[in-house]
Amino acid sequence: MGIRRIGLVVPSSNVTVETEMPALLSRHPGAEFSFHSTRMRMHTVSPEGLAAMNAQRERCVLEIADAAPEVILYACLVAVMVGGPGEHHRVESAVAEQLATGGSQALVRSSAGALVEGLRALDAQRVALVTPYMRPLAEKVVAYLEAEGFTISDWRALEVADNTEVGCIPGEQVMAAARSLDLSEVDALVISCCVQMPSLPLVETAEREFGIPVLSAATAGAYSILRSLDLPVAVPGAGRLLRQDSAVTAS
């Protein structure tokens, strides 16, 4: 089968997804992966900064296509969700169309679409969120997920505008925000609604503490990549979402 080649389109100041995604998929029992990134300039997570970043998408898609990936993940969740309900479908379709014009058959996923996909895979209706965003952007994320049919029971915005600083948010701060949520009637917790906010070491710990499925933008992205490649979803130590097919691979 060979090494599965994954393309990542990331904000220039994002370093976490390029750390957490390889760490996750390196645990897969049946496949090897390589990761190849292209970058869109962005430092401040604001409507203006996100719009300027999204304007660079076509250039980045052309560049990443040269690496001939099997799957491309558009790895900035809020940049898609600020576009309004259903934007992940439009972005994924536009990128796929651009790739096809250039002769690439790469599959296309987005962090925004992957989170929706992951929550549905967990059959979650009532959801709680921890986001790093300023409150107005966090409200757009909440509205986006509610438009997808989820009930956002409670949420927290850590209100960090500098994207480099988002990548340095301590795990203790993320867990403190999660503990402040009302999780009494929640089906799932998104402990990091952002691929730049580090959370991979927290997912299993939070699942044990809270007794509910816990996922992140990174684990949802890994789930979507594996499903797109028709690979078993069996990644240990990363939460219930990535154990969907563990019994199958064990047998």
UniProtKB/Swiss-Prot annotation:
Transmembrane segments: none annotated. Changing residue 133 to F: No change in catalytic efficiency. It comes from the Bacteria. GO terms for molecular function: maleate isomerase activity. Substrate binds at residues 14, 76-78, 133, 163, 195-196. Changing residue 194 to S: Reduces catalytic activity by more than 1000-fold. No change in substrate affinity. Keywords: Isomerase. Optimum pH is 7.5. It is an enzyme of class 5 (isomerase). Catalyzes cis-trans isomerization of the C2-C3 double bond in maleate to yield fumarate. Shows a strict specificity for maleate, with no activity detected toward structurally related substrates including citraconate, mesaconate, dimethylmaleate, and maleamide. Reaction is initiated by nucleophilic attack of cysteine at the double bond, yielding a covalent succinylcysteine-like intermediate. This is Maleate isomerase. It comes from Nocardia farcinica (strain IFM 10152).
